[in-house]
Amino acid sequence: MKRLKKLTREPGVFFRDYFNKKYPVRNIEQRINEIEEPAIIANSLHLAAVESAIHLSPFKIDVVFTWVDNSDTQWQQRHQQYCHAASPNNLYSNDETRFANHNELYYSLHSVRSFLPWVNHIYIITDSQTPKWFKSAEYPNVSIIDHSEIIDKQYLPTFNSHVIEAHLHNIPNLSEHFIYFNDDVFVARPLHREHFFHANGIASLFIADKSLQKMATKGTITPTLSASQNCIRLLNQRYDCNLDHPLVHTYVPLRKSGFQTAWQYYREEIKAFLPNKFRTNQDLNLATFLVPWLMYLDGKSIPNNDICYYFNIRSNKAPTQYLKLLQKNEDNQQPHSFCANDFHSEQQLYDYHAKLIAMLKDYFKI
């Protein structure tokens, strides 16, 4: 009877709810339907606010970006000199989308400064590059860190993000607690520090609802997938566990001590892949798999939800996500974050770069 009344009084709402239940929409890499997102976000914001009131002695939290400008001629020359080292057997290891610069860093950095005002310091790791728009006077709490400051010269130059990420803990003056960003990840709304690190220092672990085993069975073996599988083999040697999930494509809360532990346990295995100039199937991905899961296994992190909209900017489905994000921004129903990933698509969107930048400008009111 209630359903009949709803159908006659509010047919639009009735059919919306019916199709949402029958064909749930998922925007993220966790088992959460779009209709469930507002409640989960509201709950996470409430819990973070409650925990922030505990007033434990606050610890500093930094942010680390890795960034490359592939339009830089000097970088292109270095890249050309070594690109023969990229094996054709390692899928996408030297794909141009891996190094494409769409100026996302400007907007991602803006999202951090706008929505995470409690961040202590921001570090941008580059290969002898500085963003053209960067002026130190305008960004007093942002430092540019060159690869040579954190990576042994015998491994330079490197175009392998796994190698770069293996050395994040070497950043001078980096705080024990930090959040790692790729430049295609954006904070979508104001967030408490407790969303990333609990007041007692325990980190959040944003686990994707994906199976690495199933991904491998499909036959598309990428260096990222291989690196995760390599990490699992190492962790299984020391821990009695059954890991099969990657992390959500969003920011990653990390601790320097987690990297130090990884290097202590697996130094020889890490050093073995550092000479790889480009991603290979023999790599380890420390920042986005080995260290976060090592922290979890050592009781230094716990699973948490992050509603992160994840999409391919080259896909013809991207504009739908842009409209959805802009509408949710207007309605104050924003996700925690979103990732504007760049990889090849069979049905490639025309002028995808311009459409992305237009959305970012509109979303962040720049």
Swiss-Prot record:
Gene this protein is translated from: lcbA
EC number: 2.7.-.-
A GO MF label: transferase activity, transferring phosphorus-containing groups
Database matches in PANTHER family: N-ACETYLGLUCOSAMINE-1-PHOSPHOTRANSFERASE SUBUNITS ALPHA_BETA, PTHR24045
Family (UniProt): Belongs to the stealth family.
Pfam families for this protein: Stealth_CR1, Stealth_CR2
Keyword DNA repair appears in the UniProt entry: no
BP term (GO), one: polysaccharide biosynthetic process
Other remarks on this protein: Stealth proteins are part of a protein family that is conserved from bacteria to higher eukaryotes. Family members were first identified in microbes as proteins that help pathogens to elude the host innate immune system. Microbial stealth proteins are involved in the biosynthesis of exopolysaccharides. Stealth proteins are predicted to function as hexose-1-phosphoryltransferases.
InterPro entries listed in its UniProt record: Stealth, Stealth_CR1, Stealth_CR2
Record key words, sorted: Exopolysaccharide synthesis, Transferase
Entry keyword DNA damage: no
Protein name: Capsular polysaccharide phosphotransferase LcbA
